[in-house]
């Protein structure tokens, strides 16, 4: 199920599983099961976005890690742009680079960490090498603050 917030004008706002929603959309799936996390239909648009942001129900950053204005957030899943560092972080987690965590948008936090350490060109042109580099960084003391970090606790 895809978690959503009910917002102004009875719109459903996806707050997680965006990649799944995008993939289903591209496959032509017309209906999906959702779970309603909160009903904010009664608030005005400005308050709605502020609540989503403060509750960490949104990640208003683009594929380069720059914060977007609320008005620039895609209006549908078809407008979502792939962040190659989010893809790298997802694969890193799948391979054991870090543990699944309940922290909202934890893979985006890892993506931002990796974005500062690995060249985008490497991620886009040699994903396997970028992944190996990401695995090394994921086990480092530099990453200790990130959710799901499972690197060595000591420097042996």
Tell where the protein language model's regions lie, with residue ranges.
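Surface-exposed, charge/polar-rich loops and edge strands
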Residues: 1-6, 10-11, 25-156
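Short hydrophobic beta-strand that contains or immediately precedes a catalytic carboxylate
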Residues: 13-16
């Amino acid at each position: 199920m895809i978690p959503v917030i009910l917002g102004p004008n009875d719109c459903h706002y996806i707050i997680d599983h965006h990649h799944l929603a995008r993939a289903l959309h591209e496959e032509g799936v017309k209906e999906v099961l959702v779970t309603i996390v909160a009903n904010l239909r009664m608030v005005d648009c400005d308050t709605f976005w502020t609540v989503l942001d403060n509750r960490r129900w949104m990640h208003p950053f683009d594929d380069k890690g720059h914060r977007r204005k609320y008005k620039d957030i895609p209006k549908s899943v078809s407008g979502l742009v792939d962040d190659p560092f989010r893809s790298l972080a997802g694969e890193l987690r799948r391979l054991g680079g870090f543990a699944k965590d309940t922290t909202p948008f934890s893979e985006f936090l890892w993506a931002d960490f990796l974005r500062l350490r690995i060249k985008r060109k490497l991620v886009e042109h040699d994903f396997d090498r970028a992944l190996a580099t990401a695995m090394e960084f994921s086990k480092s003391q530099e990453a200790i603050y990130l959710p799901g970090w499972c690197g060595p606790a000591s420097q042996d």
